Amino acid sequence: MDSLQPLFEQLFGSEWGGPLFLLIKNLLLILAIVIPLLLAVAYLTFAERKIIAYMQVRVGPNRVTFFDIPWLRGWGQPIADAVKAIMKEIIIPTGANKFLFLLAPVLAIGPALAAWAVVPFSPELVLADINAGLLYILAMTSLGVYGVIIAGWASNSKYAFLGAMRSAAQVVSYELAMGFALVCVLMMSSSLNLGDIVAGQQGGSFLNWYLIPLFPMFLVYFISGVAETNRAPFDVAEGESEIVAGFHVDYSGMAFTVFFLAEYANMILVATLASIMFLGGWLPPVDIAPFNLIPGMVWLLLKIAFMLFFFLWFRATFPRYRYDQIMRLGWKVFIPLTLVWIVVLGMVMQLPEVVRQSFPLNLWFN
C-alpha cells in the first residue's frame, strides 16, 4: 500500500499528498480492525447462545437462515438482532439528562474499540506498534467505567445508579489485581510492547510460554478480566434478580446495543491479551511441521476462541457471587497474591546465572 504514496503526491502535490495518503491508509487500517471485530462480536453472541443451549440440552437459535439453506439455520440470527435493534426507538426517560444519557454509550464503546489500535495479530499486522502498548491498553480499558457511571447517573433511576456504583467499585478493585498480574509479564519480557512480549516466548515449544512460570498470575488476570467485563459470575452490576437490569435498565434500541457491543468487545480483548501475554500469541505450540506451517494469525485466533469459551462456560455453570464475596476475592486474595508473586519473581530474577542453569529457569529468563 505504501507504493501508492508517490501517486498521491503526484495528484495532490507533495504538501497535501503525503498527509492525505497517511490519513486514508490509517482509516482503512482502522476499518480493517473494527469491521471484523463487530462481526466477531455479533457471532460471539450466537456462539454463546448455541453453547449454553447445548449445555442445557436445548437447540438454541435455529430459525433465521440465509437463502433457506438448511445447514445455515440460526446463522442469520445476529443479523436479524442487529436489524431489530436499529429499528427500535431510543426512549429517554422523564427526568433523565438527555445529553449525558446519549453520551454514556459512546464513552463505553470508544475505549473498547480504541484499545485494539496496539494489539498485534502477527509480527507485521498491527495498527500502531508503540513501545508502551500494554500501558496504553490498561489506560483505555480503565476509561470504559466512566460510560457506565454516567449511564447510571443520567438515567435518573435508583436501580441504574446502584448498578453503576457496583460496577465502578468492582472495576477499580479488579483493575489493581489485573495490573499487578501484568507487571509479572513486564518483568519477564522487559518490555511493554506486545510484539516483544510474544517474541520473548519464542523457543520452539509451549514450554517457553509465560503460562507455565506465571500460571497463578494467568488465573488472576483471566478471572479479573471476567470481573472487569461484568460477566457471570461477577455480573452484579446487571443483577436481574436484584436491580432489574443494572446501569442500562432504561436503555433501548441502538443505545442499549452499543453497551452490548462494548461488553463483548472487551471480552474479546481480554481473551486476546491472555493469548498474547501467556499463551505465546501467534506462536505454534511446537515449532515443527505441520504446526509451523499454519499461519500465525490462525494460531492466535484459535487461542482467542479457546479463552472465549471459558467466558461462555462460566455463564452457564456458576451462580452469581454476592457483592461482598466479589470484593473479598479481589482485595483479600488476588491483590496479596499478585504482590507476593512479584516479590518472588524479582528474587528469582536476581539469582546468579549458575543457579539458574541448574534449574530449567533459562527457558523464560534470558
Curated annotation (Swiss-Prot):
GO BP: any one term: aerobic respiration
Record-stated family: Belongs to the complex I subunit 1 family.
GO cellular component, one term: plasma membrane
Quaternary organization: NDH-1 is composed of 14 different subunits. Subunits NuoA, H, J, K, L, M, N constitute the membrane sector of the complex.
Membrane topology: Multi-pass membrane protein
Disulphide bond pairs: none
EC top class named in words: translocase
Protein name from the UniProt record: NADH-quinone oxidoreductase subunit H
PANTHER family registered for this protein in UniProt: NADH DEHYDROGENASE SUBUNIT 1 (PTHR11432), NADH-UBIQUINONE OXIDOREDUCTASE CHAIN 1 (PTHR11432:SF3)
Database matches in Pfam families: NADHdh
InterPro entries: NADH_UbQ_OxRdtase_su1/FPO, NADH_UbQ_OxRdtase_su1_CS
Role of this protein: NDH-1 shuttles electrons from NADH, via FMN and iron-sulfur (Fe-S) centers, to quinones in the respiratory chain. The immediate electron acceptor for the enzyme in this species is believed to be ubiquinone. Couples the redox reaction to proton translocation (for every two electrons transferred, four hydrogen ions are translocated across the cytoplasmic membrane), and thus conserves the redox energy in a proton gradient. This subunit may bind ubiquinone.
Superkingdom per UniProt: Bacteria
This protein's record includes keyword Endoplasmic reticulum: no
Listed EC numbers: 7.1.1.-
Residue spans crossing the bilayer: 27-47, 99-119, 134-154, 168-188, 206-226, 268-288, 294-314, 329-349
GO molecular function: NADH dehydrogenase activity; oxidoreductase activity, acting on NAD(P)H, quinone or similar compound as acceptor; quinone binding
Subcellular location(s) per record: Cell inner membrane
Catalytic activity: a quinone + NADH + 5 H(+)(in) = a quinol + NAD(+) + 4 H(+)(out)
Keywords: Cell inner membrane, Cell membrane, Membrane, NAD, Quinone, Translocase, Transmembrane, Transmembrane helix, Ubiquinone
